[in-house]
Each structure stands twice: as structure tokens, then as C-alpha cells.
Amino acid sequence: MRTVRVIGNVEPGGGQLSALRLGVALERRGWSVHFLAGSATPGGVELFRSHGLELDVYGATRSLQYDCDEGFVSWLAPRLAEADLVHGHQFGAWWAAARAALPGVPVVGSEHNAYEWPAEPPLGGLRWAFDRLDRLFVHGPAAREQLLAMGADPALLHEGRSAIDSVEDVRPVPLPARRLVYAGRLHQEKGPDVLLEALALVGDRPPLYLVGSGPFEDDLRRRARRLGIEADVTFVGWSERPADWIAGARACVVPSRRDAWSQTAVLAMALAVPVVGTAVEGLTRVLSCGRGVAVAPEDPKALARALEHLLEGRVRTDLEGARGYAARFTSERVASLYEYSYAQLLAPVGSGSPTDPTEEMDHGVLQL
């Protein structure tokens, strides 16, 4: 079966990595997977090339994450002509895919984060696409609530799954064990500025490694200097292997202002590294049941206290429980769920239902 994955805007980020990992895992299972994008940064294109994949890009000069671009639709149409199934990631992609795909071809969408519309939401375009989509996978509670408010049928919405990096071939970077690690985009919504403010309040301060890149980097460097913690903070830059930096750390910190889930948090759990994060959106559930320590967002003092307590051994997380939770999000297990969903949509009428992979897994796999 030929599947085409369409991404609105490709940059080094969690949602794009999730789409890439899923596509690679499905190819290992015999699915033909082709990637298309509306717009892409040089780093995004290089990310795909590093995995041996060429990304076919429409070439918009602006991000198409939120845009209804008729030119993108026209560009997509001939490229989707032989597709058996189309999966769009981000509104601009699944809207365009729904317009461009041939009648009768299943079209599904994915939304990884809550919407931050740059202008008024295009309600007409949204509702038209809702009627054309066969399924819409949603990765967090905030995005689900927004979609329902904009008119999506609850039956259209399915819980999305993101796959984490494999931890089987981790090569830990030789660093002090007593360290903190942040891995993710250096963006305001991820809260790295809050982490720097908290670090300045921590007594017997450990070194902090910021693994990632993004538009907030210059601001963060200035902030570290202003706080007098410049010597304690290392800007690592983007890494395709964040697990190598997280492995063996005293804690992985996820100080997000908004987060539908968190690949970084779950990756740290798979590595048996304690996680300190914020009680926001879907991240709250990730950290529940003792799997991590949750504090209020945008509260440097609360974050500093939690880090001190963890460093001093006064607070512990359930590392085994966290590892069990993380095991549900390997590429192969996530691919099984999507493969089952695709097979349902592609099965001829009257041919019977494909085998549900959740019957062979623990029942908790469908819970974030």
C-alpha cells in the first residue's frame, strides 16, 4: 500500500520527529511511505536526510502549519494521485490533503499540540475538512477541546500516539552524573527561561545542559548572563540523539508552558532518569502515578524547590513504573496501532476486521 504523509511545516521538533519515526517504522513493516511538506527549514530538511529520506517540499516562503493555501492544494494533487491513504500532520497539511486527494481515498490527520492561530480560525475550511477526513488523531486534551469547539464530531477524533527514540543503542555522553538536562526546542512555550530562573535559585547548583535549538536561544544566553549562572549552563545545540545526553542525568526537566504530551519526558522515563515537569495539558497525565514530579507552570520558585528535593534525595519518582509506561511508546508499538487503524480504513467492505493489536498488549496502551 502506498501511503503519503503530508506535513504543513517541517522543522526540528517533536511532531515532525514523531511523523518521521512512524513513517520509518511502517516502511519496516512493508508499507510504502512518501513524505511531502508545505514549507521546511534547512534544519528540517536535514533532519529527514539524516534518516535517509528525501523530503519533497512545495516551498512556501511562510509556515503552512495554519494556512489554507490553494497553491499547496494544486501542488499536492498530482503527487497524491496514486496514494492509497494520505496522512496529514498539522491543520494546513490535512486541510490541503483533504482537498487534493482523490474521492474515496482515505485521508487522516494528526494534531500534536494545542492551536495558536495567528489570526481568526478558518472555520469554514475546518468544517469542510472535518467532513472529508476519515479520522483525526489528537495528541493532547487542549487540542481535542479546541477541535470540538470548532465543530468536530467526537467520533472523528482518535487519541494520537507519538513514538520515542530507541534506547537500545544509547551511547551516554561522559558528563557529571549530578547534572540537569533539558532537551527540546528553545522556544517560549517550552519554558526554558523558567528553568534558568529556577536554576539561579538552587543551592549547590548542578550544571545544566540545554539540548536543542530555536528562536529563544539568544534571549536565554542573555538571561543566563544576567542571572550569573552562565558558567553553569551549556548550550549543546540540536542533537539527533538526545538520549545520549539524558542518560545517567540526575534529572530531566520539562518546564513547559504548554505541552500536549512530551517525548522528552517519556524518553527520560525509558532511560530511568527522574523527570521534573509542569502540570500542563497532557503532560500532567504523563507525570501522574508517581512517574514524575509535577509543579505549577511559570513558577521558578516551585521548580527550584522540586529540583532541590530531588537532588537531595527527599523526593523520588517511580522509575520502574515510568519505564513501564515508556515501553508503550516504542516505534514498533506505535506503528502497530496506526497500522491497525489504516487497515480498518483500507479493508474492503465485508472482508472482516483486521486484528486489533491492543489485544496483544496491555490495556493501558491506549491511555496517554
Q: Language-model segments: what does each one mean?
A:
Residues 5-68, 215:
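N-terminal strand-loop element at the rim of the active site
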Residues 16-24, 178, 182-201, 215-222, ...:
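A conserved mid-protein helix/loop that constitutes part of the nucleotide-sugar donor-binding site
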Residues 56, 131-169:
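Donor nucleotide-sugar binding/catalytic pocket of nucleotide-sugar-dependent glycosyltransferases
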Residues 80, 108-134:
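A conserved, positively charged/aromatic
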Residues 88-94, 111:
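Short His-centered aromatic/hydrophobic patch
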Residues 238, 257:
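Aromatic "clamp/platform" in nucleotide-sugar-dependent glycosyltransferases that forms part
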Residues 274-277:
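Short hydrophobic beta-strand element within catalytic cores of glycosyltransferases
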Residues 289, 293-300, 309-314:
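Conserved acidic donor-binding segment of nucleotide-sugar-dependent glycosyltransferases
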